[in-house]
């Protein structure tokens, strides 16, 4: 079994976001999941990027980059796979701009249109198939 866990958008939305508290929350949730599913493998994903603020004063969420880093650190420290959607779609400078430019974000600047969610799913699917094909080709884990 593979459990895919996506973190970061909601956690980083709060102005009171604390990176170490986020890391502890990840650990608690994954601890419960591991206890319930001890044989499962885990894949963590970073957030896709989001805006904060009201329409006219909306800015790219500056905390998302930290949330993505914390998720990657946690995955590395616990030998878990991570798919870094945040950097794949443009990272700090372009993730939100790319989503907006292609009309894949809803008006709230946080949630996605159906096409935006489909694209995220397709990108993850492509990454999983690529990793599987590399695994089969090399026989390495």
Where on the chain are the PLM-derived regions?
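A generic secondary-structure signal
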Residues: 32-33, 127
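Short, conserved loop/helix-junction motifs that constitute active-site signature segments
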Residues: 35-37
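Oxyanion-hole/transition-state-stabilizing segment in secreted/luminal serine hydrolases
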Residues: 1-23
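Short, catalytically relevant binding-site loops at active-site mouths
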Residues: 10-12, 48-51
């Amino acid at each position: 079994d593979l459990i895919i866990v996506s973190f970061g958008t909601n956690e980083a939305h709060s102005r009171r976001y604390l990176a170490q508290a986020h890391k502890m929350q990840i650990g608690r949730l994954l601890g419960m999941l591991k206890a319930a599913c001890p044989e499962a493998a885990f894949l963590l994903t970073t957030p896709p990027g989001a805006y904060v603020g009201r329409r006219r004063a909306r800015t790219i969420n500056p905390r998302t980059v930290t949330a993505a880093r914390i998720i990657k650190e946690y995955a590395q420290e616990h030998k878990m796979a991570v798919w870094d959607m945040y950097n794949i779609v443009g990272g700090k400078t372009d993730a939100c701009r790319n989503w907006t430019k292609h009309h894949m974000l809803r008006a709230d600047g946080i949630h996605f249109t159906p096409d935006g969610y489909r694209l995220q799913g397709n990108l993850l699917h492509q990454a999983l198939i690529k990793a599987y094909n590399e695994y089969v080709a090399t026989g390495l884990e």
